[in-house]
Amino acid sequence: MKTTNKWVIKPDISEEVYTDREHHLNYFYQAALRAATRRTTSTVLFGQRRMGKTEIFKRVVNRLFFEQDPKDPKAVVPVYYSFPDGPLDTNTFAKQYLENFIRYYIGFYTSQPNLIADKIEGDELLEVMESSRSLFPFTRMFDRIIRWHDAIVRRKEPLCHALALEIPRKVSDVDDTTIAMFIDEFQNTRLPQYNFEIVGFMQNAVESPTCPHFVTGSAMSILSKELIGRGSLYGRFMAETIKPMTHFWGACLARKSADFYNATISEEMAAVLSHKCGGNPFYINAVIKQSQLLQKPLLDEATINDVLAVDLSSGFIWGELNDQVNRWITRINDQNITKWVLYLSALDENTNQERRGELKLENIQKTIEHHEGKVVSIKEIFDVLVKLSRGDLVEYLEMGRWFRRVDDPILLEFLKVWGQFDVKGKSIDTIQYDLRKKYQTLSRQIHNYKGYLAEIHMSQILWNGQRKKLPKEWFHHEEDILLPDFIFIYNRRRLSSGKGKEIDVLAASGGEVWVCQSKWVVGSKIGIDVFKQLQDQADAVNTEMEPIKLRMWLFAHDGLTQSAETYAREHQILWSTRSEMDQLLDHLGLRQLPDI
């Protein structure tokens, strides 16, 4: 479609900063295009909050809108809709849903993106439709859409929301066209403000081969357990999962963000920041922006800790998570008890190996009694935790009927700060002082920054090289190396048995395991002792994981001593120098190791 516009729904993240979501962008773009051949199934995108799910949907919709010819019989009409958080009645919802669909459908076929961008509605939308009648290819459907609008808006047809939900499929079926519905904030359909059924009326719509529905939202527990995982929509969706960024891409984002916001971060600290933020792009950007506001270059770990402490207690992270937590708590009746339970859940440091992070409800009960002077029953605490789990603030393992803390270190740190302020009533100044003092005394999480940089590059080579043959010369091996399809690739991993030292990179496919070590040593070659350490780690992995095949790979910046080369050859250990690592990275389209 020829236009100077680049979007019909504005992305939230600038191109200069947007990083590493190509897999998901291509996945949904191609899935939408395949719908024209009737080979696409409705799909749900799972992932923690602030991972970029909404941004992916917006960018795919924009791309579909502008990169297709609407005159092509196989063109796919993209439609984006986000379920609002506020209260709606059935007629208001039905009108919003239908008019949103009309804007995209008519706008696409008549090459009028302004219909969507300007959010034209009501009588004005109908007037624009009539004036565009000659541009629209399906005259019969054009009139039918107007009649449906009249039924919903003027005649207030009973169950008008059910009609609105079915219309996209009806249109695609009658015209034999293809429509791709991108539905955001789907969990809102389960909230109290929607006092009418949504999900039950979507069953027929999402089964359509002509109109697949791609859905996501910000409360994964509701999506997976209540909407997609049971009831009328069970079994009707495929699943795609978005995970935190690898630290290779997290470091890349940190550098891009620093350039964009005129902040400063070193190569080594970009990787450290990603590590501390758990690869969450929102947290990474927040710390970068806060460092610019404070005029503090991120050149060492202590400064990152200090800036993170500021942002957790009064900055971008505080603002986002405080809004998220308080909005969810307002939906629960006894807010005072709920706040106590949530705060205490973040403090529980249970390190039991079998059920790590399990919350002890008895401890929560005793602490509330101590501070509030009343006994809250275990059942009431249990019920509150179930409600909190629906907002992804704790994790509920439903089959075992137990709870554990969420796997989000930054959110847990925030809850500790939030609880001091909102539950215990401490002044924000005191909280900020205590937190910054605590963070300034934290020990270094990473002691060899250069070695860690090499580790995250090794990990990314494994990710990007999956199912590919890599030249043997770069591994000093007799045959080319075919990388498997990995299930996981971990950095800095200890075996549960506790045997052996921390493994720099541990990766596993179905039956193949890789044990990797990084030695960024400049000016001298690596000797046999390092290989013996690597062999000890591999032996421990063999004992615990019992792989069918085990590979060892060492990064040695300046190479090996002659005796170490012999040892590596005899024990079939792969190894790569700085030059060979750079060639691997370049071969896979990745940024080479930085010059430090």
Please state what every model-predicted region is.
Residues T241-M269, K276, V287:
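Conserved small helical "lid"/interfacial subdomain of P-loop NTPases
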Residues M1-K71:
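Walker A/P-loop-proximal flanking segment of P-loop NTPase domains
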Residues G319-L321, P409-L442:
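Short, amphipathic alpha-helical interaction segments positioned at domain boundaries
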Residues N285-V376:
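Winged-helix-like regulatory helical subdomains adjacent to P-loop NTPase cores
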